[in-house]
Amino acid sequence: MGIHATWISHLLFADDSMIFMQANKRSADRLACILDTYHRGSGQLVNRQKSAVFFSTNTGPEMKQMVQLSLGIEKEALGEKYLGLPTAVGRVADGTFDYSADRIRNFIHGWGANNLSYAGRELLLKANAQAVPTYPMSCFKLPAPVCKKMKSHISNYWWGSSVDSNKIHWQRWSKLTTPKGEGGMGFRDLPLFNEAMLGKQGWRLITRPDSLCARVLKGKYYPNGDFLSATRKKKSSETWRAILHGRKVLQKGIIKRVGPGDTINIWNDNWIPGIRSMKPLVHLENSLVQHVDELFLPGTRTWDEDLVRQSFIPSDANEILKIRPGLRMDEDTLAWSHEKFGMYTVRSAYRLLKEEQIQLEASKLNEPNSSDGSWIWKRLWKLKIPPKIRIFWWRVVHNFLPTKMELHRRHVEPEATCYTCGAAIECLFHIVFECPVARMFWDEVKKLTGIKIPKLHQATWVKDLLTGDHCSVSSAELIICGVWSLWTGRNARKHGKVEWRSAAAARHISSMLEDFIGSGTDTSSRQEVTRVRWSGPPSGWMKVNTDAAFSLSNSTGSTGAVLRDHSGSVRAAAARFYPCVSDALMAEALAVRDGLILAAEQEATRVVLETDNATVATLVRSDDGFRSVIAGVWHEIRELSLSFASFICTHVNQEGNEAAHLCARRPSASSPVMSWVGDLPNWLMEVANKDCNVESY
């Protein structure tokens, strides 16, 4: 595999074997002898008709023939696939991965779903078509023409219900791949998804350096360095080129968690989570520090606040002081900054790449920030109406309906008068409110449901229905369903398919909406709320409840912890104020640490820890918290938990954590440390007495 690389003689997967050897007669004869010995000893015979030989490009035809004769294998591995991927990929050329685009095309043809609604098409495209290239994308960088073909097939089917459709594409593909909450449909941008998938391979090289793959690639491409600084050589394999392509997204999101700080270069490494670039924004000329450990007080891992403020601009200094260096960390740790757990995920990497693309396109086209109108889309996708009508309203908000006015503007229709009445320009507002057919329909709706159409302005009516200012949400949902019914009726009349009747249409949308709501699609309103109360630990155990308060405006936090026995009797309680905290999750982690310190001080041996933060509870129970956003505190929590004879961590709703909740709101900058042992304040006694009549578990 390379001068410095690990030697590989064979690879085994299930009942398949891949054997590596030099292309010469001596090696071939020796392998044939080994296979024969195996056959005589085990009774199992290699099926040479199903076997194949792959030769490197510098193997001559005579040597190929000699090796094949010695092994008794006639077939040469040319274009063979194993587990769905080409067994050997040299330079990826046009045609190597065309099968992915062909499979998507065949999928769409096989559905035979020309009459599917947009909701049905969305489901099939996301669940099936987009999943086709996922496996090859995890190993190779697919050529741009292949991605373009796949995009074309998906886009054609979306807008025209056929892979060969040439209907109007009302929105460019990059907008369709925008998240639903920002006005798109959330389809995958395939090249970006490909890069995010390949980033996962690079992450494995970083986090699993002892794996066979990592050792082979290191020996061949970066024997004296590390993956993040490795370069691409002229004769690099397609696999290595693909992994380096995925490394780009890794370099955008990798951060170093501060432990000793001696390996973190202040100005070149990513290490400040509160700054978008993860590096100091400004390099002051008078700053002489180079590594993070130089910013600590001598002999500690506590920030030298004066030095930090002298070395950085105020905004950078404030973010640095929020970082809590790991007192128990042996080394600075690489982590993925876009996940709380610090582990790379394809989802978060894709989201990062997509956000960058959206911002870049918006700056080029001088478009407003898509998040400015995000409330519209959030309300739209929360409407309790059938999915096909939600997507219909998405088209309405974007003005994607082929009304005669719009088609005339695009020079598709010669004139723009209404198909039904012929008396006015056919815009959507006319179709659903002004046309005589529409007026009859709304009269029937009023008779049936009692809902009256509010006064709506033609320029803003689409968004007005989503604001809730002109009518209730339930009325707006019925009106939107009515608009959909009028539009489908207009299309039916245009194509002469059915005779559309106002009364029947009104009854249909009313019953459809009732059936949808009653079908159990939305169960949140019917869920019974069960009040959670504090429960005591088993006899002989102690339970410590923890909670935290966090102020986003001034980045301060406070913690509270209450230690009780199985009867509910409070043994001790404590609270502490922290003047510089990065976020609410860090405050909750500090509360857990303080709670365990309290339990240790009271000489508890069997401890149940209870917190109302599910993320912190999961991290405390996990062995992978060393990369998380609370990495420094996580190591302290882990060390404290191991000091007890028995330790359990559980999550509880806030209602069952009232005592700790009240404690966390007591300390302040003027009274930063508070503790109670024996003589408890009245407010804490009230909560304890209310909780103490519960049974232990």
Please provide the spans of the model-predicted regions.
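A helix-boundary/hinge signal
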Residues: 1-697
